[in-house]
Amino acid sequence: MEPILAPNPNRFVIFPIQYYDIWNMYKKAEASFWTVEEVDISKDINDWNKLTPDEKYFIKHVLAFFAASDGIVNENLAERFCTEVQITEARCFYGFQMAIENIHSEMYSLLIDTYVKDSNEKNYLFNAIETMPCVKKKADWAQKWIHDSAGYGERLIAFAAVEGIFFSGSFASIFWLKKRGLMPGLTFSNELISRDEGLHCDFACLMFKHLLHPPSEETVRSIITDAVSIEQEFLTAALPVKLIGMNCEMMKTYIEFVADRLISELGFKKIYNVTNPFDFMENISLEGKTNFFEKRVGEYQKMGVMSQEDNHFSLDVDF
């Protein structure tokens, strides 16, 4: 049995820390806590009213996917990961991740509630998993992995793919709006959320490195390429980014670029060997290994949380 999954009678007490790298990730998550009340969306309505019908359609569907997906991630954490993983440091991270995912879901729901005035349309968007085939396909894939009989390692990769690949193209599409100077509330919340998801993805990679018997490279590649195909179809066929003026082929390449970055972080060879086609995505938090403590998004960090004097903690650890 994997040591991180083995019964641990000390799991109810945090100290003494046994896994400093995992604990450090938890402290990073704690330092980046935020709430929806801190995001000003009052100026978005003027921009929203100026968008074309295609642009509105695209944003509404992306928000509908996001609003549902965080709940799926949380269900996996509650039903599987939090009960399987026996080391306290990881349980701290997963517990905090659940709180953050709730904030993300609330943020997306609030954005839908603010932009969409028709109550029937709101209900349609809030129930996207049932009402939208393109969203249902992604949700079904993620939910399948919650209940899969595969080992923790495989399911860890699947949910790294959900947070690292299924979200990537949609994040990029919203950053595209930022590049155009539109929707400041939506784009700022997107910065915060994409940074959080980058950290969650980094954490999955860290947990993977703690496995003594990880899934094979072939298995990892299969899961990741499957997720890439679904995400590419989502943003180039079902909900094409050309609706907001983006290039569909470049979006396909970007999703492959993100997948390569993920599989490299897991310690395997790249699959696609492509470069990032979107210059405006070079510095966002899905880059992994983010430096958001030195220069946090919106100059925003809980004061003092990371000011550790204990020599065991290092911000230079190569995750």
Curated annotation (Swiss-Prot):
What terms describe the molecular function in GO for this protein? metal ion binding; ribonucleoside-diphosphate reductase activity, thioredoxin disulfide as acceptor
Identify the stretch(es) annotated as Interaction with R1.
Answer: 313-319
EC number(s) in its UniProt entry?
Answer: 1.17.4.1
Q: Alphabetically, which GO biological process terms does the record hold?
A: deoxyribonucleotide biosynthetic process
Q: Which cofactor does it need?
A: Fe cation
| Catalytic machinery residues | 108
Q: How is the cofactor bound?
A: Binds 2 iron ions per subunit.
* Cystines in this chain: none
Instruction: Note the InterPro entries from the entry.
Output: Ferritin-like_SF, RNR-like, RNR_small, RNR_small_AS, RNR_small_fam
Q: Which residues does the annotation say bind Fe cation 2?
A: 101, 163, 197, 200
* Catalyzed reactions per annotation: a 2'-deoxyribonucleoside 5'-diphosphate + [thioredoxin]-disulfide + H2O = a ribonucleoside 5'-diphosphate + [thioredoxin]-dithiol
This entry's comment on induction and repression of expression is:
Expressed in the early phase of the viral replicative cycle.
Q: Binding residues for Fe cation 1, per the UniProt record?
A: 70, 101, 104
For this UniProt record, give its keywords in alphabetical order, as a comma-separated list. Deoxyribonucleotide synthesis, Early protein, Iron, Metal-binding, Oxidoreductase
| UniProt xrefs under Pfam families | Ribonuc_red_sm
Name the protein family. Belongs to the ribonucleoside diphosphate reductase small chain family.
Q: How does it assemble?
A: Interacts with RNR1/OPG080 subunit. Can interact with host RNR1 supunit.
* Described function: Ribonucleoside-diphosphate reductase holoenzyme provides the precursors necessary for viral DNA synthesis. Allows virus growth in non-dividing cells. Catalyzes the biosynthesis of deoxyribonucleotides from the corresponding ribonucleotides.
Q: What protein is this chain from? A: Ribonucleoside-diphosphate reductase small chain
Q: Identify the species of origin.
A: Vaccinia virus (strain Western Reserve)
Point out the gene that encodes the protein: OPG048
